[in-house]
Amino acid sequence: MSSVSQARSLGKYFLLMDNILVVMGFYMVFPLISIRFVDQLGWTALLVGIALGLRQFIQQGLGIFGGAFADKLGAKPMIITGMLMRALGFIFMGIADKPWLLWVSCILSALGGTLFDPPRTALVMKLTRPWERGRFYSLLMIQDSTCAMVGALLGSWLLQYNFKLVCLAGALLFLFAAILNAWLLPAYRISNAQTSMLEGIRRVLYDQRFVTYVFTLTGYYILSVQVMLILPIRVNEVAGQLAAVRWTYAIEAALSLSLLYPIARWSEKRFSLENRFMAGLTIMLLSIIPIGMIHNLQVLFLLIGIFYTGSIIAEPARETLGASLADNRARGSYMGFSRLGLALGGAIGYSGGGWLYDMGNQLDIPQLPWVMLGMIGLITLLGFYRQFHQHHYQTYSXYLSGTTKNNSYKQ
């Protein structure tokens, strides 16, 4: 094995190890925020939704600046600083007894994510070849689902004793991840060329095709973020016990472990990235509409499983499509900007989802948030259909050959 290939291989193993800590730390805390502050403390879903939306919007909305800093300074200092800031945010969350304290903790967590997320994503692009990238994203998703389940199980177990323990455990995982990155992560440069911050940002903003794709993702994320807000609340309502919330993540993990990689391998040779993404989005929107009408826990879990199946189909295609559209001369800036759709979708999805949930309860129309989410999904699907057919996106076969829209793939 050549030294370059060995470096790539070791780098990918480190990314997988690092991802375990990051995902477990996140899911140990965030899925339980709505349970803690809405169900246990009696806050409105809108109030908690604003906090979660604020975290999402700041982290993803400022991602282009985090990515631009990483293009300039390298990945390592940004990742370490961001993880330490996320740990501090979790400590503040553990003592939050007023809305402003929860918001401060979410802002700190968001700023940490702004610093470490774009360079980590750009490292995946740097360390994987185009033809293996889709499969590596699938492996990361399998790992995400498994670690999310384990993190949520540990968090819900600790919640029986004290929410402070939940937040402390999450903070310790991010602290450990920061130490590992300081010790083991090489000082990678994530872009192919020496690019100034302003030049990297300019490249992204003038790339109309990429910008359009990112903003259209807003509707997709409005649907997907509900697994962190009103979906756990709905499961808790139907089941009448907190333990049932854990099973939603167990379902996701089981489906990911059994289906994600086989589906990715099978579909990548038969369908375009665009069609795979739209098929997954279609399944998600069709499964989310009836949730408010269901009062049987088994049927609810079935719909959740179908929703996750749609996500399993859509997510690897979305990640790979976004990477194929990025300019390798400014990887960090592109990957940072790519999170803007999640920023907008998260802010609208959390605050809007919480508001719709409260309105549905006030009007005694529990179906309201779910039907509206389905309509948003349909509009998004139509937007992607028009976009993909108008702009003639780069085909998957061209992507596998290592050619991007801006330049040949270079490491």
Swiss-Prot record:
PANTHER family: MULTIDRUG RESISTANCE PROTEIN MDTH (PTHR23517:SF2), RESISTANCE PROTEIN MDTM, PUTATIVE-RELATED-RELATED (PTHR23517). Keywords: Cell membrane, Membrane, Transmembrane, Transmembrane helix, Transport. It holds the Pfam family MFS_1. It comes from Baumannia cicadellinicola subsp. Homalodisca coagulata. Belongs to the major facilitator superfamily. DHA1 family. MdtH (TC 2.A.1.2.21) subfamily. GO terms for cellular component: plasma membrane. This is Multidrug resistance protein MdtH. It is a multi-pass membrane protein. One of its GO terms (molecular function) is transmembrane transporter activity. The lineage of its organism: Bacteria, Pseudomonadati, Pseudomonadota, Gammaproteobacteria, Candidatus Palibaumannia. The chain crosses the membrane at residues 13-33, 45-65, 73-95, 99-116, 139-159, 165-185, 213-233, 243-263, 288-308, 340-360, 365-385. It is found in: Cell membrane. Disulfide bonds: none annotated.
